[in-house]
Amino acid sequence: MAQPRGAGLGGLARPSGGIGPILVVEDDSDTRHALGEMLTDLFPGSRVLMAESGEAALELIRRTRPRVVILDLHLGGIHGFDFAAHVAAMADGPPPAIVALTGDASPDTVRRAEAAGFAAFLRKPADADTLETVLRPILEA
């Protein structure tokens, strides 16, 4: 179930000539690549970046300043909520909007995501229609 939210962690100003990079952070290779393909089809003007760990994603965020990060909450190494706190603490400009992606859509997890400032919540498996419904308003804001 997708639950878009308004404010979240904020977002970067819309860049001229496009909607900015989208970063997928997912440790499962099949899921990561499927999301990448769907996003490329849905947002052909955007660069879709992929990371298999939170640590790799933090480095990509520093270098590429994505507009949106789609984040698996249950990564190995760093939990999604800790990752979001690291991103929010980065001092080099406004943080990207972070969209939670998880198979755990329990009320407690949804509340924690809202409290952590996630821009939206996606339940796995996310289909193309749901991705577009949740991401387009964030990307076009």
Spell out what each predicted region is.
Residues S29-L49:
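Two-component/phosphorelay signaling modules centered on CheY-like receiver
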Residues E59, F81-P94:
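Short amphipathic alpha-helix used as the core "switch/output" element in two-component signaling
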Residues G76, S106:
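The feature encodes the CheY-like receiver
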Residues E26:
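Conserved acidic carboxylate
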Residues S53, H79-D82:
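Acidic catalytic/metal-coordinating carboxylates
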Residues A126-L135:
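C-terminal output helix
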